[in-house]
C-alpha cells in the first residue's frame, strides 16, 4: 500500500500542475483586450447590410453587453475615415460591443445610392440593433454618428424603433431642413435649393458623383435634428473641428446651443481646433493626435453612460 501511494503521488502532482496551467491560460485569455472584428452581412428590410462587429473578450456575468452603433457620413463607409476601427478596439477593451455598417450605396453595399435616405438609414440601424440583440444579448445601446451619420443619430430617437441611451455626434450636418445639405455648395445655398427643386421635378439629382433621390431630399427638408435632440433629452456628446469648411457657422452655433440646453449635453471643441471635418490633418503628428483625442473623449462619454 505504501508503495502504491508513492507511485500515485507524482501523477497527482502533475494533474494539479496541469489544472493550474489551464487556469492561467484561461485567465490570460479573459484579459485579452478584445475579440477580433468580424465582417458579416445582417438581414435588413431591403436585403443584406454589410457590417463589422467587434465584441469584448469577456463581459461581466449576469450583465447585458452594451452596444454602440457607428454611423458613417455622406458617401462614406464603415471605416469612418479611419476612426471607427480603432474606436471599436477601444470600446471592446472597455467591455462594449460595436457594429459599424455601410449604408445604401456606400462601401460594400450593393444597393444603388438612390436608396440612401434618412428613413432607410434608420431602418438599417433598426436591423443591426435587432440582430445584435438577438444574437449576442446586448442591452443598453448608443449611437456614434459623423456628419450625415450624426444627423441620422440625432433623428434616430424619432425615426428609429429601438430606445437608445446616449448619442455621440462628430460634426453632425444638423442644419434645419434643406440647410442640412449646405455642404453640397457651402458658398451658394441657392444652388442647393436648385438641386432640391430638380430632384422634386425629375425624381433625382446628381451631386458629389452620386444620385440623390427625391425621397432623400424630402427627408432632409422635413427633418429638424436639433429639435429632435432637445425633445429626446438624451445625454449627447458633440464635437466640431476648427476647420469644418463644409458646415456653416450657423449650423454649428445652433447645434451647440441645442446640445448645451440638454441636462447631460457635452460640447468638446478644443482638442480639434487643428482638424478638418473628418478629424484629419496633413501633418502626421497632428493627424495621430486628432484621432487619439476623438476616440478618448468618445470612449469616456460612452463608458460613463453605458456602464
Label each region the model flagged.
Residues 42, 78-80, 106-138, 288-289:
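Catalytic nucleophile-loop/oxyanion-hole region of alpha/beta-hydrolase
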Residues 49, 151, 158, 163-301, ...:
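The alpha/beta-hydrolase serine catalytic core
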Residues 65, 72-77:
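Active-site glycine-rich loops that stabilize anionic/oxyanionic intermediates
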